[in-house]
Amino acid sequence: MKMNRHFTVPQNGESSTIQWTKRNSKITNPDGSKVFEANDILVPEDWSQVAVDILAQKYFRRKGVPKYLKKVQEDGIPEWLQKSIPDTEKLESLKPEDRFGGETSALEVFHRLAGCWTYWGYKYKYFSDEESAKIFYDEIVYMLATQMAAPNSPQWFNTGLNWAYGIDGKSQGHYYVDPSTGKLVKSTSAYEHPQPHACFIQSVDDDLVNEGGIMDLWVREARLFKYGSGTGTNFSNLRGENEPLSGGGKSSGLMSFLKIGDRAAGAIKSGGTTRRAAKMVCLDVDHPDIENFIDWKVTEEKKVASLVTGSMLNNRHLNAIMSACYEMEGEDRFNPKKNSSLKKTIQDAKKVLIPDNYIKRVIDLARQGYKEILFEELTTDWQSDAYNTVSGQNSNNSIRLTNEFMAAVEQDQPWNLYFRTEKEKAKVEGRKAKPSQTLRARELWEKISYAAWASADPGTQYHTTINEWHTCPEDGPINASNPCSEYMFLDNTACNLASANLQKFVNLETLNFDVEGFRYLCKLWTIILEISVTMAQFPSKEIAELSYKFRTLGLGYANLGSVLMVLGIPYDSQQAMAITGAISSIMHMTAYATSAEMAKEQGPFVGYAKNQKHMLRVIRNHRRAAYNAPSGDYEGLTITPIGINPAFCPSYMLKAAQEDADLALSLGEKYGFRNAQVTVIAPTGTIGLVMDCDTTGIEPDFALVKFKKLAGGGYFKIINQSVPYGLKKLGYSPSEIEAIVNYCKGHATLNGAPVINTQALKEKGFTNEILEKVEASLPLAFDINFAFNKFNLGENFLTKNLGISKEIFDSPGFSLLEHLGFTKEDINKANDYVCGTMTIENAPFLKEKDYPVFDCANKCGKYGKRFLSYESHIRIMAAAQPFISGAISKTINLPEEAVIEDIKNAYFLSWKMMIKANALYRDGSKLSQPLNSVLELLNGIEIDDQEEIREATISKDPVQIAEKIVTKYISHRRKLPSRRAGYTQKAIVGGHKVYLRTGEYEDGQIGEIFIDMHKEGAAFRSLMNAFAISVSLGLQHGVPLEEYVDAFTFFKFEPNGIVSGNKHIKMSTSVIDYIFRELAITYLGRYDLGQVAPEDLRGDEIGSKRATAESNGQEKETLSSMTAVIEPTPKKEVETISYSQMISKEKPSSSPSGISLLEEVKLAKIKGYTGDSCSECGSFEMVRNGSCLKCMSCGSTTGCS
């Protein structure tokens, strides 16, 4: 093919207009500990910090890159395009540790991608000459650097490693078809033929251990997950539960095998360290186990609820029983008939159904001298042991619905289920199969809808519609999809994806769409994806052969929602549907026209001749949709597609869409097609962030105000850049736009603010210096209160200038502005002015008729009421679907208050509008998702029998609970009693077990600590012992614990990171940091040093008033009381926090803003995020991405995109 330049100029190539700069990249956990860091990396100047972080963290090759390279001579390949390998002679001059490193420049990554594609394209004669190859290389590097397009993640992970650096490895059992001979070959190298495909569909036979069977599938899946890809399978071939086996006996059923596959997938991170495995499980609606499949995730969610509740109740009541065994002396204390306290705790335990044998076990342990039982409390966090314990958490589930089933639902008809063996036997014998069971279709429909409402699964795939648009039905039906449901083709095939950033093709001056530039991009990226098929290796023989035979591609786009907003067009409108159809048609038909051009030179795909009439029928139907043909004109369709309505489409876009449709059909009829499929709409999760897209795939925006990451760390608030352009398109003046934008994102200054402004604060005692600090922090503040905390103002100013004691401003929930006399209404007014409302509703000058242009997937800000309906999501999908080979991966968001009937309507409308697949997500349908309404409903509700619980679990002796204590240094050591109370806390810090033991005085004050890390080696262990002794001596000489806490928290060294086994603390920067966080929380009430709020706990706090009693040589120890006592410090009273306060009182977090965990969830949801935390970096910036989640901070996803 002859290539022409479009974006680059000959003399300068790809870098002609690209400015480069050096940046640092650092991703941290919420506590400040480092997840990833890279310094002085070369990147395009225009890239955001998020894009830089994702490229550096996820897509840079981190090791194995030689410092010196040399070219490998190859006949017919120009020198600039030849492979490189390590230059061993030059490397020998370096120290061994300096010879290999990682990529440090975006240009290196772009070079290995574009160079590898160009190399394979040139080698197999995709270009007419060397000049065309050079143009192709330059244009691709330019498009990558300017964020116009990006390939799927496996390309970034794997492509070009061998070509650019000579990186290789042992073969992992892959296969490829040699392009020169057409013969299947087993790979001898891990990277010479890369695995660039993200999406796979695999078959499974009803066979346990042979090739192609059930256990073989898990091996094939593992091979895909290892290299960062996702896979889907239709499991309808597997026999149902109790279905007869050929050798006698009954089948264990489909579900038993799905659980094995779920466990296998859960154990693997996709791409090694990048993401967890992603898989799709499909099942036909006539399978005998369909009801169990539908209920799978609903049932597992119930198990999670039971595990969490049960663990908390067991921990509380069993420890209360153990404590009661030490309420009196002698053997009678173990007899509930003699020990009234023990009797009461047993009665309470039996009320909540604690197992009798566990109650007996605890009493037996107490009789043996044990004083505590470690009963881990599980949580509803989706990464917790509760979710890890149950099945069904590692796949997206979908049901294949036929037109016959949907008609049966419409008409309230019966629906038959069939044993697999009977169905196969009837097919062979040419008769009608006998049903194994008959249900009412509507009952099954109700079950599907309830499950989706309750657990967000199963999704639906419309089998008949999918196969009516199938280009190759002679080779079998389409049975399944990839995990995100955009790739739909034959079993044992693969698809590699790429997405265009539509925003790059909108001229921000004229607000016209650059049709010619978009066409050029679609042509080049179709060629890239086709070359990728040529160079690829695959995880099995079948996939290698069939992917080579059909050569399916997955070109798509992102940022459609932003483009519509920039153009001033509501997402939910006829204009949006028409423009979506036109853009999709231009992309799709340009890709098919390019495929036909390649077929002219390379020949059509192997399976084309057999399927020619079907494929041309499908292409003609695509063309008819571009012309908005009447329903009677379409061939072989039962549901009429949504065509491009000329009344609502800009004429130049409509003309281009129809021209491209004409060209694709005419070239295809003449030359055939090189590819059976060319387009999908993927969720573009991580790659969408690399391209700095505001919206992913076909999605609308999720918020109008965003928080942009700064290069030096932190965030600042910006308006979605689509908003001012959209307002300009709607005719608003610059001054009106400025007022509307300021209403949304805030003025970021106190000047002119109502009530709380510079003058008012000066009257309260604020100095000019402090006011400057406040002003400087306002652009970064989400809430005005964040600018008025001790970290920003300084403790000296608060104590000396404002006269506020440390005890007051350190107290949880302290608000300086309220303390200064401003009312909540005053603060809200000032907050709206300074920090913005986060919504456009009720903005000055904005006409209500223009509100729909700025509607988002969620309500915006705390005042926002508007959001896009599920119907609008479905309509925009319906507009694009007639111009997509595969399907559309999209989240259809529903509010929490959506009812089951809404789910039914959404699924039914999707079928009626010819959508191929649908996934719904109702806010709060996952138990793991924090939900504002739940927090608001339950906040402040206390347990009715609080006093009974206290009687059963807390020592009644109120000695020194409210005693005023003055702490001072004492020259003589205050000795601890020979027998002393205390507690033992076991935890794991960064994978290392730590045992912390405390010893206390009779009054409950801490007097000593013991630290044991018994597997860490003699030297380290001895140092920890010595450190514990020195701290203990200090405590016994009167050094306040608070001093140690201030000195040693945030102390950083290895081991560090994730903490498990502790209720409050989930992250620490070192073992020392963890120890003093734990002591501060237990003895000082410093919940700000933990990551889990006390209101999240259910009465398992370690009591700090522990009376000591002699009884048969054993001490009495309250192990799980409902009272936490704050350790006294100079001139402070000991504060007692009741159990009810623990539930309702918010804790400060460890962040400088001092907000609670509950508040953090609420704020995240106000910003448009889901309220979930990221498993990689801990931020609360998760958004829905297809049927998965994506972190807007570090780019991690819970799926395969």
Curated annotation (Swiss-Prot):
Stretch list, region Disordered: 1100-1120
Annotated CDD domains: RNR_II_dimer (cd02888)
Catalytic activity: a 2'-deoxyribonucleoside 5'-diphosphate + [thioredoxin]-disulfide + H2O = a ribonucleoside 5'-diphosphate + [thioredoxin]-dithiol
Keywords carried by this UniProt record: Cobalamin, Cobalt, Disulfide bond, DNA synthesis, Nucleotide-binding, Oxidoreductase
Comp. bias (Basic and acidic residues): 1100-1118
Cofactor binding description: 5'-deoxyadenosylcobalamine (coenzyme B12).
Keyword Disulfide bond carried by entry: yes
GO molecular function: cobalamin binding; cobalt ion binding; nucleotide binding; ribonucleoside-diphosphate reductase activity, thioredoxin disulfide as acceptor
Required co-factors: adenosylcob(III)alamin
Cited InterPro entries: RdRp_reductase_class-2 (IPR050862), RNR_2_N (IPR013678), RNR_lg_C (IPR000788), RNR_NrdJ/NrdZ (IPR013344), TSCPD_dom (IPR024434), YebC-like (IPR029072)
S-S bridge residues: 199-495
GO BP: any one term: DNA biosynthetic process
Active site (record annotation): 482 (proton acceptor), 484 (cysteine radical intermediate), 486 (proton acceptor)
Class of this enzyme: oxidoreductase
Family, similarity comment: Belongs to the ribonucleoside diphosphate reductase class-2 family.
Known function: Catalyzes the reduction of ribonucleotides to deoxyribonucleotides. May function to provide a pool of deoxyribonucleotide precursors for DNA repair during oxygen limitation and/or for immediate growth after restoration of oxygen.
Protein name per its UniProtKB record: Vitamin B12-dependent ribonucleotide reductase
